């Protein structure tokens, strides 16, 4: 892609927009940054853009496809692209191979980040410079996707891709790609369920070596079956059950591959590792977190699909530690008869992720902190499905009504405490105190809110950090010493 002397409008000067602006300027482009909140922006309003002289637009995920400036650019025939599309078209040759570094792309409603991190860790253990990039939150502009794509030292890029980014991306031809799952999320942004799925499916288009899909998700399986990939590209389904031919899964306590990606013939069972080796994906009693096991299977299939050394990759995967705010025990209070454990899963920002989190625990053992910015979601199905696990619920957030209504209609016998949303600074302290009134030995206080965090917190990480602090304080005050 030649951008010298081209005029590019950057819509939104967050980390990715600012980084891309720098990359484009270094290549001789004339960049116009538009952001009403950033003093360094060239313009504060799209009304001030001289569209007659614009060649390209980079749109931030904050702007949906029906935003007026997007429609105006498209009306004029100006390409509207994501940072991902720009990065793909600007990528440079690796200094050792003389060709662009392979990209492994991971998308899905949930599980993207853990899968991307596992993939990177295994490839790094194999001696490759394989950073994570893309939708993974980072304030480091040197590791933005546009910077990584134009760095000749990287051997592989492990790219987390959101549906927002994929909407304005059209030319990707990934080396390996995965869709972890698809559930209703961001439907208002995309304009419906089918549009959302169609944007997710772009990771499979023209993939070269392997596409990895959730064989237990009917929609993802459909997208994989329909995917138009390069000749010879392997399609690998992952399952938490015994795998069929073409799949990788769990059989008799072992990770077993029947897809051929681990070196055997398609349909031939190849035992890779005992599931008991993955203690980091399990409860203290050894019971596995199903969604983290699914992420591990996905990542393993991706790196083997790229041709990584199997034994080295498996060794790295068995020592992988999930990142913060993902089903992480942050405090434990000794009480009469046992203990109460506090688990932070703040990254569970939608109902699908919260369901996976809740389903990891025994019946009637969870005091659930739920709520936040619902984004138009309804929770009746979630509450009905997980009522057997929930002992009590504590509802936070400014958008509480959807969660309140779900409990009233689907689980009226479960006690619910509603936290006054007025004081953001103390909301988590009050929520944890309320949980303490329900908790007894053997219980789990689980913060997996099923909602976004921006109504009362800076981010899901801020929400998780405040929960951890409140949990530790409660444990010190109320625990037996």
From Swiss-Prot:
GO cellular component, one term: cytoplasm
Enzyme class, spelled out: ligase
Molecular function GO labels: ATP binding; UDP-N-acetylmuramoylalanine-D-glutamate ligase activity
EC code(s) of this entry: 6.3.2.9
This protein's pathway: Cell wall biogenesis; peptidoglycan biosynthesis
One BP annotation, GO: peptidoglycan biosynthetic process
Localization of this protein: Cytoplasm
Major subcellular site: cytoplasm
A Pfam family per the record: Mur_ligase_M
Statement: the UniProt record of this protein carries the keyword Cell division: yes
The reaction(s) this protein catalyses: UDP-N-acetyl-alpha-D-muramoyl-L-alanine + D-glutamate + ATP = UDP-N-acetyl-alpha-D-muramoyl-L-alanyl-D-glutamate + ADP + phosphate + H(+)
UniProt-annotated binding residues for ATP: 108-114
Protein family (similarity comment): Belongs to the MurCDEF family.
Functional description taken from the UniProt entry: Cell wall formation. Catalyzes the addition of glutamate to the nucleotide precursor UDP-N-acetylmuramoyl-L-alanine (UMA).
Stated name of the protein: UDP-N-acetylmuramoylalanine--D-glutamate ligase
Organism taxonomic ancestry: Bacteria, Bacillati, Actinomycetota, Actinomycetes, Bifidobacteriales
């Amino acid at each position: 892609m030649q951008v010298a002397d081209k005029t590019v409008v950057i819509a939104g000067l967050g980390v990715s927009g600012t980084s891309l602006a720098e990359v484009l300027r270094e290549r001789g482009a004339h960049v116009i940054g538009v952001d009403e909140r950033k003093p360094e922006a060239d313009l504060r309003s799209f009304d001030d853009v001289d569209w007659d002289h614009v060649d390209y637009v980079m749109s931030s995920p904050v702007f949906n496809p029906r935003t007026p400036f997007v429609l105006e650019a498209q009306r004029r025939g100006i390409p509207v692209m994501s940072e991902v599309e720009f990065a793909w078209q600007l990528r440079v040759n690796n200094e050792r191979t003389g060709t662009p570094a392979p990209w492994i792309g991971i998308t899905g409603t949930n599980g993207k980040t853990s899968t991307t991190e596992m993939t990177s860790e295994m490839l790094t253990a194999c001696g490759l410079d394989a950073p994570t990039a893309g939708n993974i939150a980072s304030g480091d502009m040197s590791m933005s996707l546009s910077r990584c794509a134009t760095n000749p030292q990287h051997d592989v890029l492990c790219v987390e891709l959101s549906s927002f980014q994929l909407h304005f991306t059209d030319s990707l031809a990934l080396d390996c790609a995965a869709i972890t799952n698809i559930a209703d999320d961001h439907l208002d942004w995309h304009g419906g369920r089918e549009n959302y799925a169609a944007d997710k499916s772009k990771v499979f288009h023209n993939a070269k070596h392997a596409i990895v899909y959730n064989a237990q998700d009917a929609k993802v399986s459909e997208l994989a079956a329909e995917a138009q990939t390069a000749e010879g590209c392997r399609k690998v389904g992952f399952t938490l059950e015994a795998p069929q031919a073409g799949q990788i899964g769990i059989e008799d306590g072992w990770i077993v591959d029947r897809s051929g990606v681990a070196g055997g013939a398609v349909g031939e069972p190849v035992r890779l590792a005992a599931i008991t080796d993955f203690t980091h994906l399990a409860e203290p009693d050894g019971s596995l977190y199903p969604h983290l096991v699914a992420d591990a299977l996905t990542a393993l299939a991706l790196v083997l699909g790229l041709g990584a050394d199997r034994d080295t990759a498996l060794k790295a995967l068995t020592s992988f530690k999930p990142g913060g705010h993902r089903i992480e025990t942050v405090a434990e209070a000794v009480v009469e008869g046992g203990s109460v454990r506090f688990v932070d899963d703040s990254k569970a920002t939608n109902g699908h992720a919260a369901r996976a989190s809740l389903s990891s625990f025994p019946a009637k053992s969870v005091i659930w902190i739920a709520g936040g910015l619902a984004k138009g979601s309804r929770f009746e199905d979630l509450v009905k499905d997980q009522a057997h696990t929930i002992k009590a619920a504590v509802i936070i957030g400014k958008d509480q009504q959807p969660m309140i209504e779900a409990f009233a209609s689907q689980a009226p016998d479960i006690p619910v405490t509603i936290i006054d949303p007025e004081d953001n600074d103390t909301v988590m302290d009050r929520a944890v105190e309320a949980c303490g009134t329900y908790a007894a030995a053997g219980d789990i206080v689980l913060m997996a809110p099923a909602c976004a965090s921006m109504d009362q917190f800076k981010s899901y990480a801020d929400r998780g950090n405040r929960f951890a602090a409140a949990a530790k304080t409660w444990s010190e005050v109320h625990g037996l010493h």
